[in-house]
Amino acid sequence: MPLRNTGAAISPFNSFQILQGIETLALRVDRIVENAVKVANFLREHPKVEWVNYAGLPDHPDHALAKKYLGGKVPGLFTFGVKGGRDAGARFQDALQLFTRLVNIGDSKSLATHPASTTHRQLNPEELQKAGVREETVRLSIGIEHIDDLIADLEQALAQV
């Protein structure tokens, strides 16, 4: 089959979209990193949060390595634990309004998932433990939305737990 029949040449609009994405990547990454640090600090201080696992926080065991290898820009993907276990984590996820309930990473939009009730729901507590997933774990992928909106959504969802 000749190459010309496989669609190897993208349209001008698709080329423009790719170029826009590449040109704005640094700005989006900076915003994600900035938002992630603020969200992690907010969660760390919240009374309904049991723990936060984010290498961007100074008390994380790998913080120095993250600073060294990532140039101080720790990505926006991290986990935290909602007090109350599996049911609390599921209720929290269901209450989110701005965060999209999606198992993905690295988007401009903020995403959340509660593995014990989604990707790992078929596992019993012992199997979850073997897989390294706690029942209260929520995974966040932070996006570029305004930080006040992100924190407001997390706050209202935690209030429903």
Give the role of each language-model region.
Residues M1-L77, G81-S110:
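Active-site C-terminal subdomain of aminotransferase-like
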Residues R28, D94, S110-V161:
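PLP-dependent enzyme catalytic core of the Aspartate aminotransferase-like
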